[in-house]
Swiss-Prot record:
Alphabetical UniProt keywords: Acute phase, Disulfide bond, Glycoprotein, Pyrrolidone carboxylic acid, Secreted, Signal, Transport
Keyword Nuclease applies: no
Annotated glycosylation sites: N25, N34, N76, N94, N104
Classification via InterPro entries: A1A_glycop (IPR001500), Calycin (IPR012674), Lipocln_cytosolic_FA-bd_dom (IPR000566)
GO (cellular component) term, any one: extracellular space
Primary subcellular site in the record, as a coarse category: secreted
Signal peptide range in chain numbering: 1-18
Induction / repression: Synthesis is controlled by glucocorticoids, interleukin-1 and interleukin-6, It increases 5- to 50-fold upon inflammation.
TM spans (from-to): none
Disordered: annotated span: 188-207
A Pfam family matched in the record: Lipocalin
Encoding gene per record: Orm2
Matches recorded under PANTHER family: ALPHA-1-ACID GLYCOPROTEIN (PTHR11967), ALPHA-1-ACID GLYCOPROTEIN 1 (PTHR11967:SF2)
Listed name of the protein: Alpha-1-acid glycoprotein 2
Length: 207
């Protein structure tokens, strides 16, 4: 859904930088460092996506809101992904792991038994990142935006809109979610409290 990822070409950077270097400072294909992973280790909000793949587009249209937590493992180059989707006013939770390809600057995920990839595009000054996928395919390409805050600035929205047009899509293809329709915050809170209690119990038993 928010993080469906497929291998992409690397022509995005020059197109974006040529548009307006003052407001768009984007790199693609940069190696993923420990610093990048530490920065990614946080709670993120799926803001929206422009997706031409009809199956993915249909899934996003049904989604009212998504937030997720990323927890990298620096030893085995994986990242735990915990997603909270609000669909039809109900919360749907999912947990999985992403692979990290440091040198290529990509993340990977198994979907339907197939390993797929996406380039990570870091927008650190905006507290956001994009995932670009399948840009070579005119019928399936897509670009998603994720941020540390659900209420993004007009500047970040403009950066995303320009990126979408530069990869060959129209702004009208963008589907933004509505963070005010969140139905998962309470469930996340309960899960975190339960995990704290679970961690506490073994320690008390050893005391």
């Amino acid at each position: 859904m928010a993080l469906h990822m497929i291998l992409v070409m690397v022509s995005l950077l020059p197109l974006l930088e040529a548009q307006n270097p003052e407001h768009v400072n984007i790199t693609i294909g940069d190696p993923i460092t420990n610093e990048t992973l530490s920065w990614l280790s946080d709670k993120w909000f799926f803001i929206g996506a422009a997706v031409l793949n009809p199956d993915y587009r249909q899934e996003i249209q049904k989604t009212q809101m998504v937030f997720f937590n990323l927890t990298p493992n620096l030893i085995n180059d994986t990242m735990e992904l915990r997603e909270y989707h609000t669909i039809d006013d109900h919360c749907v939770y999912n947990s999985t792991h992403l692979g990290i390809q440091r040198e290529n600057g990509t993340l990977s995920k198994y979907v339907g038994g197939v390993k797929i990839f996406a380039d990570l595009i870091v927008l650190k000054m905006h507290g956001a990142f994009m995932l670009a996928f399948d840009l070579k395919d005119e019928k399936k390409r897509g670009l998603s935006l994720n941020a540390k805050r659900p209420d993004i600035t007009p500047e970040l929205r403009e950066v995303f809109q320009k990126a979408v047009t530069h990869v060959g899509m129209d702004e009208s293809e963008i589907i933004f979610v509505d963070w005010k329709k969140d139905r998962c915050s309470q469930q996340e809170k309960q899960q975190l409290e339960l995990e704290k209690e679970t961690k506490k119990d073994p320690e008390e038993g050893q005391a």
